[in-house]
């Protein structure tokens, strides 16, 4: 008769289920909640008796946890037991499978240093003999030796059905100090007899490097290079910058560089672009990755590869004929002899089932598929594709036309030093801001405007609108001049100036002239006198 436990969580899942101990083994099946058809179709998790290597009991997230180390299926964690279940489980495991249930207490000191133990299925970090935390190898997607004494662990977030409950740990770094001395195995017995030569034949190796190599072997991180379907050697990447060997497997891709290695699943590749570079020497390939690759705090949502335009590759797939006929006949070719970027594009298209985007109908003034421009302080090229803008190479920007509210053209035609260039401002929908590409040659303006209008993208030319507003304003001003300017000019000449001059003379005379109080008749008589006296009078006043 079996023993059942309800409300048990498998491998920290968000859905509980039923755990059962039977004569032939044990199993877990999720409980169907809310009539969910997806839950009802879930297959049970089964473990036979001969798969059990060891079983441990410890505190868990939802009560007490049963951790099962298997021989071939990694670590199985079952959480949600009560403290009273320990005796029943211990007796059942002993009676049915002859397996001892070991009680493990965790260290709760909170110290960030201790010792590591690489066991069959997991990495255990311990303090004073008590485990602080455990990391199953199945959760580690990649590891890198980031410095002489530091090892980085990257965790796998790409599993099928992965559904995080909230914030997730994506990377951990371990500081591993110290060195270990290794003897040179190629040394001869005569050299070993000599003490000085023996010292020379000993090599120092950091403990971090030894830990890194052992972890890679234990966790089986990355497939063996010889198992790759196809490989490309020494490919130059502009993002992340460096040269990498590309090993393409059935479901994943591994980039092996001098310092770092990256692993991505085929399903992470959202888009593939194959674009000629404007220098007519190189060809670019861009992979859009979601979620992006990570290196510390840096994320890489786009991988940019650069090839010589005429570089060719002759390669054969590393698969058996029957496997090729069964899996790859309709997707790949058995043998390739073509340009390198064409071969890689075809292979990625076949394995990821993703369309390769190439330049569309747009041609610049110089018959190229891109225009030179700058984004902030970075110079690059803007590719007007059939459905989007793309800026290369750094940073890589992709703006679909469906996200564009309007395109504003400014600085075109101004009588300044910048009159030979214009700016292209791409305004996004839903008030998501704008992106400006500056210093585009004015020769490209008309061609670019026509292309965008053909794609039903709203284009606004600020210079044309400004000129139209100015002409409208000047037109209204000229009409006002025909009505009012004549009388205004006449008033200025016949009234205002004479009155102003006359009043000024009177004021000066009253203030400085001793004869300023003469009668009006005397003034008229003086006006009829010789005009030569008036300049001398003004000179006297001055």
UniProtKB/Swiss-Prot annotation:
Subcellular location: Nucleus; Chromosome
Span list, region Disordered: 458-542
Domain of life from the UniProt record: Eukaryota
Cysteine-cysteine disulfides: none
Biased composition (Acidic residues): 477-514, 521-530
GO-annotated biological processes: DNA repair; DNA replication-dependent chromatin assembly; DNA-templated DNA replication; nucleosome organization; pericentric heterochromatin formation; positive regulation of RNA polymerase II transcription preinitiation complex assembly; silent mating-type cassette heterochromatin formation; subtelomeric heterochromatin formation
Keywords: Chromosome, DNA damage, DNA repair, DNA replication, Nucleus, Transcription, Transcription regulation
One Pfam family here: POB3_N
GO cellular component, one term: FACT complex
Molecular function GO labels: DNA binding; histone binding; nucleosome binding
UniProt miscellaneous comment: In contrast to the orthologous protein in animals and plants, this protein does not contain a HMG box DNA-binding domain. This function may instead be provided by the HMG box of the associated NHP6 protein in the FACT complex of fungi.
Record's subunit section: Forms a stable heterodimer with SPT16. The SPT16-POB3 dimer weakly associates with multiple molecules of NHP6 to form the FACT complex.
Family: Belongs to the SSRP1 family.
Function summary: Component of the FACT complex, a general chromatin factor that acts to reorganize nucleosomes. The FACT complex is involved in multiple processes that require DNA as a template such as mRNA elongation, DNA replication and DNA repair. During transcription elongation the FACT complex acts as a histone chaperone that both destabilizes and restores nucleosomal structure.
Protein name: FACT complex subunit POB3
Organism: Eremothecium gossypii (strain ATCC 10895 / CBS 109.51 / FGSC 9923 / NRRL Y-1056) (Yeast)
């Amino acid at each position: 008769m079996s023993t059942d436990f309800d409300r048990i969580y498998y491998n920290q899942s968000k859905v509980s289920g039923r755990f059962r101990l039977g004569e032939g083994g044990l199993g877990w099946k999720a409980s169907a909640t809310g009539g969910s058809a997806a839950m009802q179709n879930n297959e049970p998790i089964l473990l036979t008796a001969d798969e059990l290597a060891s079983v441990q009991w410890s505190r868990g997230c939802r009560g007490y946890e049963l951790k099962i180390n298997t021989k071939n299926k990694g670590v199985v964690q079952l959480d949600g037991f009560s403290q009273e279940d320990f005796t029943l489980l211990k007796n059942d495991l002993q009676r049915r499978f002859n397996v001892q249930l070991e009680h493990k207490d965790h260290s709760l000191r909170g110290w960030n240093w201790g010792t590591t133990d690489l066991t069959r299925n997991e990495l255990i970090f311990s303090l004073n003999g008590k485990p602080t935390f455990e990391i199953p190898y199945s959760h580690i997607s990649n590891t890198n030796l980031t410095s002489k004494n530091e090892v980085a662990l990257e965790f796998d977030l790409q599993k099928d059905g992965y559904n995080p409950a909230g914030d997730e740990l994506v990377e951990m770094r371990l500081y591993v100090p110290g060195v270990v001395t290794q003897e040179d195995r190629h040394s001869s017995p005569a050299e070993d007899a000599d003490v000085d030569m023996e010292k020379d034949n000993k090599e120092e190796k950091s403990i971090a490097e030894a830990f890194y190599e052992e972890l890679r072997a234990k966790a089986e991180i990355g497939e063996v290079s010889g198992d790759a379907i196809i490989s490309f050697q020494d490919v130059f990447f502009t993002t992340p910058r460096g040269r990498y060997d590309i090993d393409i497997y059935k479901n994943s891709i591994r980039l092996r560089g001098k310092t770092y290695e990256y692993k991505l699943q085929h399903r992470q590749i959202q888009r593939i672009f194959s674009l000629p570079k404007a220098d007519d020497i190189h060809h670019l390939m861009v992979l859009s990755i979601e979620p992006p690759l990570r290196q510390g705090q840096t994320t890489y949502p786009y991988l940019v590869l650069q090839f010589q335009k005429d570089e060719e590759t002759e390669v054969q797939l590393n698969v058996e004929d029957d496997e090729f006929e069964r899996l790859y006949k309709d997707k790949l070719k058995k043998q390739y002899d073509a340009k390198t970027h064409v071969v890689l594009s075809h292979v990625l298209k076949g394995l990821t089932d993703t369309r390769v985007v190439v330049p569309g109908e747009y041609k610049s003034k110089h018959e190229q598929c891109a225009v030179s421009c700058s984004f902030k302080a970075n110079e690059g090229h803007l590719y007007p594709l059939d459905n989007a803008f793309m800026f290369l190479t750094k940073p890589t920007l992709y703006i679909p036309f469906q996200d564009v509210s309007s395109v504003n053209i400014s600085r075109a035609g101004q009588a300044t030093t910048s009159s030979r260039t214009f700016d292209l401002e791409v305004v996004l929908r839903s008030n998501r801001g704008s992106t400006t590409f500056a210093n585009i040659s004015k020769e490209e303006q008309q061609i670019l405007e026509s292309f965008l209008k053909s794609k039903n993208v709203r284009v606004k030319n600020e210079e044309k609108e400004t000129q139209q507003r100015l002409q409208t304003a000047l037109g209204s001003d000229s009409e006002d001049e025909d009505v009012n300017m004549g009388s205004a000019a006449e008033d200025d000449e016949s009234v205002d100036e004479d009155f102003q001059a006359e009043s000024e003379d009177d004021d000066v005379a009253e203030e400085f002239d001793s004869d300023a109080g003469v009668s009006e008749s005397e003034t008229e008589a003086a006006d009829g006198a010789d005009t030569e006296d008036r300049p001398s009078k003004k000179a006297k006043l001055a």
